[in-house]
A protein has these predicted regions:
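Serine-hydrolase catalytic machinery in alpha/beta-hydrolase-like enzymes
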Residues: 2-105, 109
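Primarily recognizes the serine-hydrolase "nucleophile elbow" in alpha/beta-hydrolase
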Residues: 108-135
Length: 135
C-alpha cells in the first residue's frame, strides 16, 4: 500500500509492468480527485504505461464543503491568498516527490496538469521546479 500526504484517486496503468510515466491531475476549486479522474479514464487507452493520480486538495472548500480547495479564494487580502498558495505548493511538492519515489520515476516522466484552480497551482509549481517536470 502506497502512502501519500493527500487522499488520492488512482487510475492504475493498463500495462502489467511498473508504470513508466505518472500524470498528476489537480482538480478545480470545489472539486475533488474523483471529479478529475474521469479525464484519466479517457486518456488511459493512449498512455497504457502511465499511472494517473488525482489528489484531493488539502483544504475543505470555503463555498462547497463537499469539495476541496488548494487555497482559499474568498479572502479579500491578496497577500493572504499568496501565502496560502505557497503552503499548498509546498504540500503538493511533497506529494510529487512521493510519487517519483514510489514509482522510481525520473522527473521528466511526471506530468502535472490541472483544471481551474488546479491549473493555477500546477503552473505555480512547474515554473519553480529545479528538475523539470511536464506541465
Amino acid at each position: 500500500m502506497t502512502s501519500y500526504n493527500f487522499e488520492v484517486t488512482t487510475i492504475t496503468s493498463l500495462s502489467k509492468n511498473k508504470p513508466q510515466q505518472a500524470i498528476v491531475l489537480c482538480h478545480g476549486y470545489g472539486g475533488d480527485g474523483r471529479d478529475i479522474s474521469v479525464l484519466a479514464n479517457n486518456w488511459q487507452r493512449f498512455l497504457p504505461e502511465c499511472i494517473f493520480l488525482c489528489p484531493n486538495a488539502p483544504e475543505i472548500c470555503a463555498v462547497n464543503p463537499q469539495g476541496y480547495q488548494w487555497f482559499d479564494l474568498t479572502l479579500d487580502k491578496e497577500e493572504v491568498i499568496l501565502e496560502k498558495s505557497l503552503i499548498a505548493e509546498e504540500k503538493l511538492n511533497i506529494f510529487l516527490d512521493q510519487v517519483l519515489d514510489n514509482f522510481q520515476l525520473d522527473p521528466s516522466n511526471l506530468a502535472l496538469v490541472g483544471f481551474s484552480q488546479g491549473c493555477m497551482i500546477s503552473i505555480q509549481i512547474a515554473l519553480k521546479k529545479k528538475k523539470q517536470i511536464n506541465c
